[in-house]
Amino acid sequence: MRDIKTYLSVAPVLTTLWFGSLAGLLIEINRLFPDALVFPFFSF
């Protein structure tokens, strides 16, 4: 039971950090390359 409580308290923190960093990354990409349909660093 204690392991379940530990998991339920750790998982929301990790998902919040993950989605927060993902949102920040997407915001910075859109700031550097506004309205880009093809990103320059993906083209070969």
From Swiss-Prot:
Read off the InterPro entries from this record: PSI_PsaJ, PSI_PsaJ_sf
Q: Which UniProt keywords apply?
A: Chloroplast, Membrane, Photosynthesis, Photosystem I, Plastid, Thylakoid, Transmembrane, Transmembrane helix
Q: Name one GO cellular component term.
A: photosystem I
Please state where this protein is localized.
Plastid, Chloroplast thylakoid membrane
Membrane disposition: Single-pass membrane protein
Q: What's this protein's family per the entry?
A: Belongs to the PsaJ family.
Name of the protein in question: Photosystem I reaction center subunit IX
